[in-house]
C-alpha cells in the first residue's frame, strides 16, 4: 500500500463520519440559487454526468443538489432484460464482487471477507435462509444514476436499520478496512420472491446524507439504534414491488448488496469484479435444478 493510501486509510478512522455527513447533507439541501447552481454545475463537470438521459436536463431546474443527485431518468433509458426469469441488476455502477456465500461469510476484497449475519444486523435467524447462497455487490460512483430498483418482483417482509460508521466506500477501503460493509450504516430490505427470500442491503458511506425507501421515505431513526420494521403482519396491507420498480435511493451514493438463497440463481458469466453495469441489465438467471 502506498504512503498516500496509508494516510487515506488512517484518516478514515479519525474523521467524524456522521458530523461530516450531516454538514454535507445540509449543503446538499440548500435552495439558495447562487450556491446550488454552482455546486450542481461543478459536480456535473467534475464527474462528466450525462444529463441527456435525465427527465430534467436543465441543471438550474433542480431545487437543490439532492434533487439533481437523485434525478429520475427518461422513460426507456434503462430497458429491462427480457430473458425468461432474468434477475435484474438493481443499480447503475460497477460490480465490486459477486459469488457464493461461504461458511457464512461474504467476499469483500483480496484478504478480506465479512459476516453475513453482521451485515444483516447480527441476526442469525435473518441470515439463515442465505447461508450457502449467493451475493452481488454493486458500487455506485458519483456520476451514476442513484436510484435502486427491484431485481425481482417481491413482497416486502421486513426492513432493518443498522447503525454504524460511515467509512468511504471505494477500492482502497474495500482492500484495507476489515468488514467494511458490515460496519457502515445500512438499511436491510427483505422480500419474498419467486426465487425465495431476497435481501437488498443499501450501505451508506462517508458524506452519504441519507438513505430512502419508497415505502418508508427517509430511514433515519432518531436514536441511531438498530430498529426492525415488520411488514408481514396481518394488520398491514402487503407492500409488493414489481421487477424493475424503484426500491430506494441514496442521497450521495454508495453500495447495494443483493443476497439470494442457495441454488436459486446463476450469475451472468460475463460479470466479475469491476464489470460496469446498468440498472435493468441481466445480473443472473434462475439456476437449473
Swiss-Prot record:
Post-translational modification summary for this protein: Is synthesized initially as an inactive proenzyme. Formation of the active enzyme involves a self-maturation process in which the active site pyruvoyl group is generated from an internal serine residue via an autocatalytic post-translational modification. Two non-identical subunits are generated from the proenzyme in this reaction, and the pyruvate is formed at the N-terminus of the alpha chain, which is derived from the carboxyl end of the proenzyme.
Molecular function per GO: phosphatidylserine decarboxylase activity
Sites of Pyruvic acid (Ser) modification: 254
Keyword terms of this UniProt record: Cell membrane, Decarboxylase, Lipid biosynthesis, Lipid metabolism, Lyase, Membrane, Phospholipid biosynthesis, Phospholipid metabolism, Pyruvate, Zymogen
Record's bilayer topology term: Peripheral membrane protein
Active site (catalytic residues): 92, 149, 254
A GO cellular component entry from the record: plasma membrane
Chief location category: membrane
Localization in the cell: Cell membrane
RNA-binding keyword on record: no
Names of required cofactors: pyruvate
GO biological process: phosphatidylethanolamine biosynthetic process
Pathway given in the UniProt record: Phospholipid metabolism; phosphatidylethanolamine biosynthesis; phosphatidylethanolamine from CDP-diacylglycerol: step 2/2
InterPro entries: PS_Dcarbxylase (IPR003817), PSD-B (IPR033177), PSD_type1_pro (IPR033178)
Reactions the enzyme catalyzes: a 1,2-diacyl-sn-glycero-3-phospho-L-serine + H(+) = a 1,2-diacyl-sn-glycero-3-phosphoethanolamine + CO2
Annotated site location: Cleavage (non-hydrolytic): 253-254
EC number: 4.1.1.65
Keyword Lipid metabolism: yes
Note on how the cofactor is bound: Binds 1 pyruvoyl group covalently per subunit.
HAMAP family reported in the protein's UniProt record: PS_decarb_PSD_B_type1
Function: Catalyzes the formation of phosphatidylethanolamine (PtdEtn) from phosphatidylserine (PtdSer).
Assembly information from the UniProt record: Heterodimer of a large membrane-associated beta subunit and a small pyruvoyl-containing alpha subunit.
Family statement drawn from the similarity comment of this UniProt entry: Belongs to the phosphatidylserine decarboxylase family. PSD-B subfamily. Prokaryotic type I sub-subfamily.
Protein name listed in UniProt: Phosphatidylserine decarboxylase proenzyme
Organism of provenance: Pseudomonas aeruginosa (strain ATCC 15692 / DSM 22644 / CIP 104116 / JCM 14847 / LMG 12228 / 1C / PRS 101 / PAO1)
Gene for this chain: psd
Amino acid at each position: 500500500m502506498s504512503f498516500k493510501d496509508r494516510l487515506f486509510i488512517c484518516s478514515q478512522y479519525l474523521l467524524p463520519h456522521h458530523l461530516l455527513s450531516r454538514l454535507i447533507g445540509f449543503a446538499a439541501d440548500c435552495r439558495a440559487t447562487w450556491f446550488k447552481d454552482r455546486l450542481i454545475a461543478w459536480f456535473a463537470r467534475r464527474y462528466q454526468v450525462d444529463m441527456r438521459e435525465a427527465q430534467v436536463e436543465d441543471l438550474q431546474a433542480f431545487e437543490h443538489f439532492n434533487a439533481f443527485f437523485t434525478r429520475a431518468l427518461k422513460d426507456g433509458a434503462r430497458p429491462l432484460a427480457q430473458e425468461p426469469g432474468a434477475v435484474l441488476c438493481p443499480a447503475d455502477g460497477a460490480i465490486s464482487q459477486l459469488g457464493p456465500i461461504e461458511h457464512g461469510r461474504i467476499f469483500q476484497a483480496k484478504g478480506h471477507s465479512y459476516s453475513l449475519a453482521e451485515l444483516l444486523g447480527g441476526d442469525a435467524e435473518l441470515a439463515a435462509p442465505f447461508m450457502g447462497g449467493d451475493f452481488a455487490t454493486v458500487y455506485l460512483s458519483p456520476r451514476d444514476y442513484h436510484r435502486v430498483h427491484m431485481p425481482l418482483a417481491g413482497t416486502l417482509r421486513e426492513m432493518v436499520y443498522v447503525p454504524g460508521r460511515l467509512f468511504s466506500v471505494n477500492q482502497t477501503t474495500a482492500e484495507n478496512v476489515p468488514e467494511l460493509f458490515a460496519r457502515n450504516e445500512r438499511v436491510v430490505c427483505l422480500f419474498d420472491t419467486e426465487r425465495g427470500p431476497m435481501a437488498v442491503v443499501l450501505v451508506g458511506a462517508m458524506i452519504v446524507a441519507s438513505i430512502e425507501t419508497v415505502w418508508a421515505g427517509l430511514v433515519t431513526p432518531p436514536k441511531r439504534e438498530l430498529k426492525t420494521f415488520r411488514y408481514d403482519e396481518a394488520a398491514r396491507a402487503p407492500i409488493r414491488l414489481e421487477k424493475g420498480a424503484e426500491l430506494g435511493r441514496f442521497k450521495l451514493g454508495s453500495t447495494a448488496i443483493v443476497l439470494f438463497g442457495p441454488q436459486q440463481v446463476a450469475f451472468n458469466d460475463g460479470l466479475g469484479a469491476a464489470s460496469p453495469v446498468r440498472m435493468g441489465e441481466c445480473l443472473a438467471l434462475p439456476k437449473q435444478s
